[in-house]
Amino acid sequence: MSFINKANYFMKGMKEKPIYVYTKEEETKYENYIKDSIGEFDKVYHELYSPDIHVDILIIPPTETQNYYKLVTMGMGAYKMNVPDIIKDQGYDRAELVMYLPPDWNLKFKTEEDGWVIRQLKLIARTAIEENSWVGFGHTFSGDAEATIPFANNTKLSSTILLYALDKEYEQLHFHLPNKDRINFYQVFPLYKEELEYKQKYGTEALMRLFDDKDIIPIVNINRKNYCENIELDKNNDEIEEDLER
């Protein structure tokens, strides 16, 4: 079972605050699972300051068959999320994140254009513990309340949605801690403002049906087509899908 290190965080004028981290055994098993299911990582983006959970990001380089970077969080799943009572016993209370980047992405993450992906991963990873809530399939996140401000100057993408992440065999990714608790992996997929609005009205599955196959592949494409740019949201979903098929 993940332990709480109560002696790791102090700030002047504040009460002691627990940090949720994997044990050494859990961390080793997790790393081995990533190597077997997603790929060998050759870099780790280490978190220098951890007020609540310790979230490192494993970086898996492109290969001949999968020509893109894979970013995988490590540490988010040490915290057991406060899921709704209706799914309390269904194994949705632990999660980790995956994000895929094109092979020419600058991994120094020093500029807005390159670094927003790290900020999104960190933001989502801490949402559950900061808000005493949970994250899961179909949940959306943005950099501002209205999702109107793009992540960077070179894109109009302004929010993200969580989809189920798949392993090398295209099966849904799950990892089990030694205590048998399941950790679900979610793909962080960027959206445009109009796509977020469509999802909020019609749901995740309806939004995904609009995408071409080439854009469903979840590699971040900062210039991809906006699938909801010219859609009238006052129509019902069946009318919209009929219009798109014409």
PLM region spans:
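Acidic, proline/glycine-rich low-complexity IDRs
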Residues: 1-72, 76-82, 88-92, 98-246
